[in-house]
Regions:
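Alpha-helical transmembrane segments of multi-pass integral membrane proteins
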Residues: 114-191
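Long, glycine/tryptophan/cysteine-rich extracytoplasmic
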Residues: 25-99, 151-167
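Hydrophobic alpha-helical transmembrane segments
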Residues: 92-116
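Generic detector of intrinsically disordered, low-complexity, polar/charged segments
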Residues: 18, 63, 80-82, 129, ...
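Alpha-helical transmembrane segments of polytopic membrane proteins
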Residues: 17-18, 96-105, 163-176
Length: 191
């Protein structure tokens, strides 16, 4: 056991948590992409025509799917308005995307937490919750990277997931809570 893992229950590894968190974030994005990229491409056609008319680069579908993935964590996307203000939107909450997208991150995180607890061999609720919550190590890193990767800029205008809410909800709250729940289930149902 490494020095950084010494405070963790026996068998729980931050390295495994990082790997599981990374895999879970990427898988969640890919599920969202495969499911919604065609619809998003169609929805962006009108916006992209206007943007290109004024000499800007079109919004790539992969970035807009990223916004939708953050929306599935209840993280709104901020975009500028005429007159210098900004507005936040959640495409799922606004009815522009399937509500079922809200279950993608929690389900994947519960499964990851479950797998982490089982692989660590822990058998009690607290150790399982800690093992499952260790998914935060990788998930947080990719949640922060996603905030940068899914930022779209045209001229002086920028659209992006809300930074602080993205870190707090998508990066910390979701993996700790849902990974912890999965880990607790994995530990307490082990035979």
């Amino acid at each position: 056991m490494s020095e950084t893992d010494s405070a963790l229950p026996r068998g729980v590894s931050l390295r495994n948590g990082f790997a599981a968190g990374t895999l879970t974030f990427v898988l969640g994005y890919l599920v969202t992409y495969v499911w919604q990229s065609g619809t998003i491409r169609d929805s962006l056609q009108g916006y992209n025509a206007v943007i290109e008319f004024f000499g800007g680069d079109p919004i790539p579908a992969w970035q807009a799917v990223g916004w939708l993935f953050y929306n599935a964590h209840f993280v709104a996307v901020t975009y500028p308005t005429f007159g210098g203000g900004s507005v936040s939107m959640n495409l799922i909450a606004d009815g522009n995307a399937p509500t079922l997208l809200y279950v993608v991150p929690p389900v994947l995180l519960v499964v990851a937490g479950f797998a982490l607890a089982r692989s660590a061999g822990v058998r009690d609720f607290d150790s399982g919750a800690i093992a499952g919550a260790s998914v935060v190590v990788g998930y947080l890193v990719f949640a922060v990277l996603g905030l940068v990767a899914f930022r779209y800029t045209a001229g002086g205008s920028t659209m992006h997931p809300e930074y602080s809410v993205g870190v707090l909800l998508a990066g910390l709250f979701y993996p700790v809570v849902f990974g912890g729940i999965g880990g607790a289930i994995g530990a307490t149902t082990a035979t």
